[in-house]
Amino acid sequence: MKKMLVEFRDFALKGNVLDLAVAVVIGAAFGKIVSSLVDNIIMPVVGVLLGGLDFTKLSVTVGKSVIQYGAFIQSIVDFIIIAFAIFIFVKILTSFMKKKEQPVEETPVPPTEEYLKEIRDLLKEQQKEI
């Protein structure tokens, strides 16, 4: 049992697990921001463009049940905006990583310099022979 607790502690304290936990917390906070953006800015504008339609109040009553499809539409818009924001973030991040990984190319040596180096080396060899 003690070995299992030690293994769990080692697993939980690994950098990847902690990074994932931080990402989940930040993602949840980001989701709240996007939901607020959709609920308070985007959907009211869409509602005005559609003739004063308030999506939060769209519903259908079936028997004693109320189906709030307006809230569902808002959830879809939330998802699309969050997915697009994550896509843009990942795209920017990968472009930075690609720039960082690209090796610096050496400038090619002009042929005249190569010839001069060969002549120098030949002259050194001739002087050694003398």
Swiss-Prot record:
Membrane topology: Multi-pass membrane protein
Taxonomy, superkingdom: Bacteria
SUPFAM superfamilies noted in UniProt: Gated mechanosensitive channel
Keywords associated with the record: Cell membrane, Ion channel, Ion transport, Membrane, Transmembrane, Transmembrane helix, Transport
Pfam families: MscL (PF01741)
Family per record: Belongs to the MscL family.
Protein name: Large-conductance mechanosensitive channel
Organism (species): Listeria welshimeri serovar 6b (strain ATCC 35897 / DSM 20650 / CCUG 15529 / CIP 8149 / NCTC 11857 / SLCC 5334 / V8)
